[in-house]
Amino acid sequence: MSPQTETKTGVGFKAGVKEYKLNYYTPEYETKDTDILAAFRVTPQPGVPPEEAGAAVAAESSTGTWTTVWTDGLTSLDRYKGRCYDIEPVAGEENQFIAYVAYPLDLFEEGSVTNMFTSIVGNVFGFKALRALRLEDLRIPPAYTKTFQGPPHGIQVERDKLNKYGRPLLGCTIKPKLGLSAKNYGRAVYECLRGGLDFTKDDENVNSQPFMRWRDRFLFCAEALYKAQTETGEIKGHYLNATAGTCEEMMKRAIFARELGVPIVMHDYLTGGFTANTSLAHYCRDNGLLLHIHRAMHAVIDRQKNHGIHFRVLAKALRMSGGDHIHSGTVVGKLEGERDITLGFVDLLRDDFVEKDRSRGIYFTQDWVSLPGVLPVASGGIHVWHMPALTEIFGDDSVLQFGGGTLGHPWGNAPGAVANRVALEACVQARNEGRDLAREGNEIIREASKWSPELAAACEVWKEIKFEFEAMDTL
C-alpha cells in the first residue's frame, strides 16, 4: 500500500454502509435557481422510512452508491450530490409520498435530454428498497433550458409557413395503417387534402416495409400534396415518417423529404430515442422542415399511476429535444387523458411561462425563457360530434387529427375531410360570435349540417359512438 493511500484510508475513510439519509436527506436545503428539481411519487418497501427512501432516490440518481467508497474523498459531494429537500404525503394513500429532489446543474451535459434522463431515471427505478417509483414532474431551470435549441420552428413560424391563422389545424392519419401500396396510399392522401384538411399523416409504425418502401411512399405523397395544393390554393402537408433503424438512415429520409420540397417530416421520438430526435430537430431547423412527433410507446412508461414517468415530463423533454407537434391525448376520444391534467401539460408545451398548479398536476413553476412552443395534437377516436369540445378544450394552437373520423365517412375520404372542415369552421365562427361551445356544441353542428350533406352524413354515422371509460391519469 502506498503512503498516499495509507494516509487517506487511515485519516478520512471508514469503510462500511451508511444510511442514505445521513448525507442525502437535507430538509434545511434552499433550492437554487440553477437546480433541476424533481418530484417523485415514492412507494417504499414496508419498514423503509420516508426519509431514507427519499434520500435513496436522491443518492442513487446522483453521486451515491450502496456503500462508502474511498474515492468520495477525491471530490466535493456537497457540490455534486442530489438532495431530498422535502417529503409530502400523498392524500388517500397509506404508504406513498412525494419526494422532492434537487440536482446541481453541473451533473448534466448541456443540450442532452439523453444524459438528463440517464442520470435522473436511468438506474434508481430498479432499486430494491422501493416498491414503486414515478417521476411526476421536473423543473428545468433557465440556465439549462438555454443550452437546448428546442422545437425546430415553433407555433408562430409554422403558422407563417402555412399562412393559416385563427383556427386549429386539421389532420388525418391514413388507414389502414399497414398494407396499402404506395400508390394507393398517395391516393388516400390526395383525397383527404383536397377535401379540406391541412395535413395527412403516416401512422407511427409506417416506416419502410415490404409492402411499401419509404422512398415510394414519399414520392407518391409529395405528388398528392402538390396536386391538392394546386386545386385548393392552400398549403398542404403530409407527415412523412423518417423514423428508421439507424440515425444515418433516418437522416437520409429527412434529406430526401427536403429535396422533394415538402413542408414536414415525422419522428417516433420515444422508440427512436432522444439522441436521434435531437439530431433530426437540428436538421429540420437548418433546412426549413417542420417536425411532427408521435409518442408511440409512451403508455408503457406513463400509464401506471405509481410507477414510471408522467407524460408531462416526457412532454417537457420533447420541447427541449425538439418537435413542432406532439400527440397529447384528446380528453374526449378513445385514448387516455383527464381534462385538467391534459391541459396542464398542453400549457407546458405551448406557453412560455407556466405557474405551479397542483390541481392540474404541475408541481413547479416553469419558465421556458422563449424556447419555441409545440402544437398539441388531439388524435384517437374523435369525429365531427367532438369538434365543439375539441375546439373549446384545445383552442386555436392545436392540431385536431381525425383518422377513422375522416376515412370512415360513408361517401369516402374527400367527403369525410369536407365534413370535418365544415364542422371546424362552424365551431370557430360560433365561438367568435360569443356562443358557448360546451353548452351549444351539438346545436352548432346540427345547424351546420343543414348546409353540408357531407357533414350531415357524418353526423348520422357517428351519432352513437362514445368512449366512456374512466381515465387512469388522475391526481
From Swiss-Prot:
Co-factor: note: Binds 1 Mg(2+) ion per subunit.
Molecular function terms, GO-annotated: magnesium ion binding; monooxygenase activity; ribulose-bisphosphate carboxylase activity
SUPFAM superfamilies: RuBisCo, C-terminal domain, RuBisCO, large subunit, small (N-terminal) domain
Positions where N6,N6,N6-trimethyllysine occurs in the chain: K14
Propeptide: 1-2
Residues involved in substrate binding: N123, T173, K177, R295, H327, S379
Enzymatic class: lyase
InterPro entries reported for this sequence: RuBisCO (IPR033966), RuBisCo_large_chain_AS (IPR020878), RuBisCO_lsu_C (IPR000685), RuBisCO_lsu_C_sf (IPR036376), RuBisCO_lsu_fd_N (IPR017443), RuBisCO_lsu_N_sf (IPR036422), RuBisCO_lsuI (IPR020888)
Localization, UniProt: Plastid, Chloroplast
Catalytic activity: 2 (2R)-3-phosphoglycerate + 2 H(+) = D-ribulose 1,5-bisphosphate + CO2 + H2O; D-ribulose 1,5-bisphosphate + O2 = 2-phosphoglycolate + (2R)-3-phosphoglycerate + 2 H(+)
Modified residues (N6-carboxylysine): K201
A Gene Ontology term for the protein's cellular component: chloroplast
Keyword Phosphoprotein tagged: no
Post-translational modification comment from the UniProt entry: The disulfide bond which can form in the large chain dimeric partners within the hexadecamer appears to be associated with oxidative stress and protein turnover.
Name of one Pfam family that matches: RuBisCO_large_N
EC number: 4.1.1.39
N-acetylproline: residues bearing it: P3
Named cofactor requirement(s): Mg(2+)
Main location, first listed in the record: plastid
Residues that, per the record, bind Mg(2+): K201, D203, E204
Keywords: Acetylation, Calvin cycle, Carbon dioxide fixation, Chloroplast, Disulfide bond, Lyase, Magnesium, Metal-binding, Methylation, Monooxygenase, Oxidoreductase, Photorespiration, Photosynthesis, Plastid
Subunit structure: Heterohexadecamer of 8 large chains and 8 small chains; disulfide-linked. The disulfide link is formed within the large subunit homodimers.
Remaining remarks: The basic functional RuBisCO is composed of a large chain homodimer in a 'head-to-tail' conformation. In form I RuBisCO this homodimer is arranged in a barrel-like tetramer with the small subunits forming a tetrameric 'cap' on each end of the 'barrel'.
Matches recorded under PANTHER family: RIBULOSE BISPHOSPHATE CARBOXYLASE, RIBULOSE BISPHOSPHATE CARBOXYLASE LARGE CHAIN
Function noted in UniProt: RuBisCO catalyzes two reactions: the carboxylation of D-ribulose 1,5-bisphosphate, the primary event in carbon dioxide fixation, as well as the oxidative fragmentation of the pentose substrate in the photorespiration process. Both reactions occur simultaneously and in competition at the same active site.
Official protein name in the record: Ribulose bisphosphate carboxylase large chain
